[in-house]
Amino acid sequence: MKDLLNFLKAQHKTEEFDAIKIGLSSPDMIRSWSFGEVKKPETINYRTFKPERDGLFCARIFGPVKDYECLCGKYKRLKHRGVICEKCGVEVTQTKVRRDRMGHIELASPVAHIWFLKSLPSRIGLLMDIPLRDIERVLYFEMYVVTEPGMTDLEKSQMLTEEEYLDRLEEWGDEFTAKMGAEAIKDLLGSMDLHAEVEQMREELDTTNSETKRKKLTKRLKLVEAFISSGNNPEWMILTVLPVLPPDLRPLVPLDGGRFATSDLNDLYRRVINRNNRLKRLLELAAPDIIVRNEKRMLQESVDALLDNGRRGRAITGSNKRPLKSLADMIKGKQGRFRQNLLGKRVDYSGRSVITVGPYLRLHQCGLPKKMALELFKPFIYSKLETRGLATTIKAAKKMVEREEAVVWDILDEVIREHPVLLNRAPTLHRLGIQAFEPVLIEGKAIQLHPLVCAAYNADFDGDQMAVHVPLTLEAQLEARTLMMSTNNILSPASGDPIIVPSQDVVLGLYYMTREMINAKGEGMYLAGPAEAEKAYRTKTAALHARVKVRITETVVDEDGHSTTETKMVDTTIGRAMLWQIVPKGLPFSIVNQKLGKKQISNLLNEAYRKLGLKDTVIFADQIMYTGFAYAALSGVSVGIDDMVVPPAKYTEIAEAEEEVREIQEQYQSGLVTAGERYNKVIDIWASTNDRVAKAMMENLSSETVINRDGEEEQQESFNSIYMMADSGARGSAAQIRQLAGMRGLMARPDGSIIETPITANFKEGLNVLQYFISTHGARKGLADTALKTANSGYLTRRLVDVAQDVVVTEHDCGTLEGVEMMPHIEGGDVKVALTELALGRVVAEDIVKPGTEEILIPRNTLLDEKWCQIINDNSVDKITVRSVVTCDSDFGCCAQCYGRDLARGHLVNQGEAVGVIAAQSIGEPGTQLTMRTFHIGGAASTAAAENSVQVKNNGSVKLNNAKFVINKDGKLVITSRASELTIIDEFGRTKEKHKLPYGSSLSKADGDAVTAGETVANWEAHTMPIITEVAGRVQFVDMIDGVTVSRQTDDLTGLSSSEVTDAAARPAAGKDMRPAIKLVDAAGNDVMIPGTDMPAQYFLPGKAIVNIEDGAEVGIGDTLARIPQKSGGNKDITGGLPRVADLFEARKPKEPAILAEYSGTVSFGKETKGKRRLIITREGGETYEEMIPKHRQLNVFEGERVERGDVIADGPEAPHDILRLRGIHAVTQYIANEVQEVYRLQGVKINDKHIETIVRQMLRKCTITHAGDSEFLPGETVEYSQVKIANRNLEAEGKEPARFERELLGITKASLATESFISAASFQETTRVLTEAAVSGKRDDLRGLKENVIVGRLIPAGTGFAYHQDRQAKRAQEQEGPSAAQATDNLAALLNAGFSSDE
């Protein structure tokens, strides 16, 4: 028996391995895997159903069909194990060897492997340096290739057509050899000397100057070096032996009715074997060349189809015209091996059912139907029945359970106690889509779900289904309880806000409970406490909303945990006093002494969590829910048609609007306004009418007049049901009420444009046919969009997870000194996001000092929690540097200090936390809420008047940032720099507002001046760009010749004349090379110099510039010499919503990106070409840089102006690659984070910046080597950043020269495919390409990420699996080192001692 056990163990041998290597298989290797050659195409005998000998299912090669039984039946039973039957040749063993025993086919002629031939770039073509077309011609027998030139003038691997070949043959006879087919290619590959090739290419690389040649050489060099280093032989890319898949992996199943269902592979294999056998026969018969050639070509095609059907030519189809599924199709795509079976498997012990409400459950419970529980917990029940001695065998136990005896239910109760189950709702968009609950047995067949977790699951009870999974092992139960229990997931991992928040009925109930009513029954009573308030309410002495005075006892808990109480009389209502009874000790009464809407309740829970911790919050949340439901029921709030009150003002408003529209129509017909203006005005009128009607309706709904105690009339908030629902945030919004009781307003067409006839009716009055039809028009688009959006959002999430899956917190502190700067987001006059909100939960990278002093407020490496943030606020700090994942220095993953607080737990992140996946989920999950639209800016909807002044909103002082200016004769400042910013600073030095100042703005305040709110500080002309003089003097025109370079116009009304500079293209020949300019001279006629330089003040005028001054006029400093009209932005589409987020993460270049200065220096313009201008930047050292810029781009710089690297030269959307190259990593991180946040903020979705930073870190994973130093890298090669870092560290340690590099920004799809792990990349996209590349270069996958480990089927190196992997690595390191000398002596001594002691 013992050896049997050992034998069975031997079958399941799992090697502990650290890496997986992929390579090309040699023919000998394939033969060594094989258990025999498949010689016949037959499968099984149709009469006996036994496999044919030497066929595709042969039992002799692949193993027995039945366990421990040979085919002819001579040997049966276990005792003959391992015997090979002499009659049928079958080894007696288990059937399952048919799943892993392979066979092989000896090919009669070599065949090229289609992946290495056709998967671009063609590896065979690249290696031999022959175009793919030519290789294909050789392979498919259309051309000869010279394999041995001999003493002829032919070259090796030269192509010859049939005729050329015959000519040469006559000329030289058998002096040379030329062949066709895969044999020829195999010979050529076999005769390559890789080392010599490398030498030659390295020499060429040094000598060549052409960029394209260099690129090609580098590519080829990398491939050849890969072949050398991996030990792959190039001729293995040509197959001479074909492996045959084990038969149980390509089954043949008899169906009833004598037909068979078979895997497509069998057809493909059969085809190969038939052709191969025919070819063998033809070769034996020495058939004519043309026949043999045709057969060889057919063999090549059939092998191609087997490996990757449809890659070349038409796909081979089966009987039903459907292309056959080849080996390549088996592994790729959503239905392929990777995504279907390795990354997502179906699991046992699970069930699903419809969900329904469980309002009486506690937060950690769920209701599980008894029937389901009985089925799911069967094994536990069986074992309990057996250990109790209630059933003798498992079979008896099974019978008892099937009969559902009474004792079984008792045991089920016991088994279920404290055994959590997992509930999952598809689609699982973030980790809160699977949570653990303790089951409570219920009658019925629906799972009961706690209402508060619906938000996390995004579940509702309109027929949603959920799946139940049972964690079986003790470890799994422990993890479910400690990590996944719903009570441990109160905060959202995306933003750190509570996600267990009441909604709908509960909110309505609490809102109703905390409202107040004037002159309600019992107003003005004095009550001794909340209990007395409740008594008054229950005995109907006082109404729920009555305003009363109640004695309240508050508990204040200080930081050390000591609590003090204080008691006082408070003005409140009966309802609020009763609600106070369930609020846990330690919260102030003021927090419930207000009308509670959804926002306030969320805040209430947040406060509770931060002040009192998890347990109290969970209990409190449950109490809130029970109370909310109870009072929602008591409130009797419902929706009746009379609750929708239509304001009487509506009809007059509409009549007025119709009158205005009629007027505009008349103006249009008489030609006073254009069609576009008429449309815009009409839409404007209706939009404002709609707003006015809505306002009147809300005023009407939201307040009512009541008589107070003194008998006077007083306004109070209305108790109208619909108003209460919207006001509390339970259901509905002002916009929806507007449609019920106001007017529906303007409708959009599917393309986003607005229909100019609005729907004046509302739903209470009812729509007529036309109005209904207009409504349906836009609504259908909405439904179609939703379906698309779900798929797109899911795909975005998949790409994000794939790129970030291997970011895990691997160490506590990486020791970096870098970080990113954080400032509050300020737009114009308002703070969009406060600094404290951004900094909360981050670690400080540089000491934060008190502004204006050297006093350190917060030392570096402090985790900023709520208390520290309060200090930042109190000391009005407005700029701090915090650590960030982007600047983290860990080689793999990131460190805890750089990540900061784990948002879902509220403390520093634990090691092993899979922060990458969390980041991906947090960004992807709200994706379905984002719109798909690109917004058309056009029409009234959104054309704001162009800004032309800065009006400040706060008192404070002016501060100018990177501004150059001159002071004109009126004493105003005129800005002469580009990217100037005006900020308003309050008395604490905090930034309150930020405004951009264009070139040529005039300021009435100087730097440091005080301003008051409402003052206008700066103004400028909106649609023109001035040219400002920085010196005073007399104007002298240069090259400004009327009719040649300028054209003059005189205004009829004013009599003033102006000149317009003609575009270079439109000038007559004489003016082509002239450069019109305005020069300033002093009274003596000498050039005036620009202050601080030795350059004369000369201003070149671009085309279309308008000059209003005369030659010889006197000008002062800061005067305008000329104006250049700017085209207004026009109707640009802004990409919004989901597509915008995808574009940012894919790092796509915008259509017309902004042009940024590559270097700092002085601008000048060179010779122009037909469509482009030549911009020259002269750097400090005198070297110049040139760039050609299309003429239609508007430039922001003039001749002679100084620019800094990264300044904008021509406006447009900035390309992230440019930002990275010119302004560095911080700038690009900030750019992507802000742009992504912009989209989410519009939808009201809150996501923490660190998630976006985590993704950006992964996008910056690669870098390009600019200078190799003493490293192994090639210049221009793209390498993993961590590799370069490690290599440079080692080089520096040895005192050698490190490599220099530039960081690269990759889009997420590209970054996923460029990952080091080929397993992860192959399971993501483009499986064929990834695997081909990996095999050729003999890649090894160190299984670092999560995905690779899931695929090979072991614990992931994150979370609880992190420790397991760390232990394994430590053990492995120890094994490799071997025992030290000292240890060896100790071991020896111990052994000897043991030997002596046992002798006694």
Swiss-Prot record:
SMART domains listed in its UniProt record: RPOLA_N
One GO term of the biological process aspect: DNA-templated transcription
GO cellular component: DNA-directed RNA polymerase complex
GO molecular function (one): DNA binding
Binding site for Zn(2+) 2: C814, C888, C895, C898
Cofactor stoichiometry and binding remark: Binds 1 Mg(2+) ion per subunit. Binds 2 Zn(2+) ions per subunit.
Role according to the record: DNA-dependent RNA polymerase catalyzes the transcription of DNA into RNA using the four ribonucleoside triphosphates as substrates.
Assembly mode: The RNAP catalytic core consists of 2 alpha, 1 beta, 1 beta' and 1 omega subunit. When a sigma factor is associated with the core the holoenzyme is formed, which can initiate transcription.
Family label: Belongs to the RNA polymerase beta' chain family.
Name assigned to this protein: DNA-directed RNA polymerase subunit beta'
Organism: Vibrio vulnificus (strain YJ016)
Classification of source organism: Bacteria, Pseudomonadati, Pseudomonadota, Gammaproteobacteria, Vibrionales
